[in-house]
């Protein structure tokens, strides 16, 4: 009998270099090798499942070993990680950060939640602290395996990001000064 799907901390999400939609049916019987052939999956690629539950929460989960049978209830995608780490806590802070409205206008989107689509995520310019600082912040929430991006109080990783908002604002002000000068 197959093991349950292994969930890993979402702190391990990296900047999305390339997103690829995957038909749900493919996971019901395919091995990683078959998926590699079909979708050009590479060694360090990570598969993300996005599940929509009856209570309206949308959950993202990372799956490292696609040899395990995976049957998502909604949609899935493959991401190709880049070297610069970006964690969901940080992404959430950015999406609720006032200057992100400028990004929304540039992408011609009507709602911030659309920024979470694979196409839009790859275009986001998120000001990032050093990787060590991101890891330190994310390690506080190491036990958190899933994040509901749409409800601030649904998950402790989202409840405690106010310090990141301050950091984002400082980054934004610094960038603005550099552009003006």
Question: What are the language-model segments listed below?
Answer:
Residues 89-109:
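Short, positively charged
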Residues 5, 12, 27, 31-33, ...:
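Short, functionally important structural connectors and interaction interfaces within domains
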Residues 11-46:
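Sequence-specific dsDNA recognition surfaces
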Residues 8, 42, 119:
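Structured loop/turn residues at beta-strand edges in well-structured enzyme cores
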């Amino acid at each position: 009998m197959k093991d349950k799907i292994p969930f890993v901390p979402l702190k391990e999400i990296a900047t999305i270099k390339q997103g690829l939609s995957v038909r749900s049916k493919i996971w019901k019987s395919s091995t990683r090798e078959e998926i590699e052939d079909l979708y050009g999956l590479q060694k360090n690629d990570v598969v993300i499942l996005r599940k929509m539950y009856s209570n309206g929460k949308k959950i993202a989960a990372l799956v490292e070993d696609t040899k395990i049978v995976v049957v998502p209830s909604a949609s899935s995608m493959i991401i190709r990680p880049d070297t610069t780490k970006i964690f969901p806590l940080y992404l959430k802070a950015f999406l609720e950060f006032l200057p992100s409205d400028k990004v929304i206008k540039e992408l011609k989107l009507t709602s911030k939640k659309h920024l979470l689509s694979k196409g839009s995520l790859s275009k986001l310019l998120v000001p990032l602290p050093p990787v060590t600082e991101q890891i330190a912040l994310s390690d506080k929430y190491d036990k958190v395996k899933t994040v509901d991006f749409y409800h601030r109080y649904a998950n402790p990783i989202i409840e405690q990001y106010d310090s990141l908002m301050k950091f984002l604002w400082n980054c934004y002000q610094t960038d603005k000064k550099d552009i003006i000068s």
